[in-house]
Amino acid sequence: NHTDKDRQTDDFYATEPKAAKLLLGLETFSPNIWECACGDGSLSKVFENAGYNVKSTDLIYRGYGEGGVDFLKTQDRWDGDIITNPPYKFAKEFVEKAIETVTEGHKVAMFLKLQFMEGKARKNLFLKYPPRTIYVSSSRLLCAKNAGFDKMIEGGGSAVAYGWFLWVNGYNGKTELQWFN
């Protein structure tokens, strides 16, 4: 558990690149990917190295991509897939916006705490937009405050369980649960 005092002010928790590499072993994606909360580029770099055309944006510039872009206020449709680890305090809003932004048949993959499955407001989100697949990581993957992975590893890793939540715009079936890692 974190108190407000322990949280990073802008909710910047970089994702371990291994999480993106594992995702690419689970799913195929459109040639065009938008990483809309790119932070320091941890995920974007993995997708670029795998040959994808990656649009990297973030509200706060952290040395990678285009800063000053508030994803929740963007108006354009995206003819590609969206993959990100959103700021957790706005995760529900990021999911809704991403699904509404990608064109039909395109994917939205969000790296989220497994506790994202809880809650009445998110239940309504899942009823309106059922994920096609939730990939549960059976080993702990890291999200490090301010990209401080070394400090996190020295401290024993993470007590938080994560997974990849995958939506397809237009999908309205049952959610499949799979394990990886």
For the regions a language model picked out, list residue spans one by one:
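Class I S-adenosyl-L-methionine-dependent methyltransferase catalytic core
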Residues: 1-181
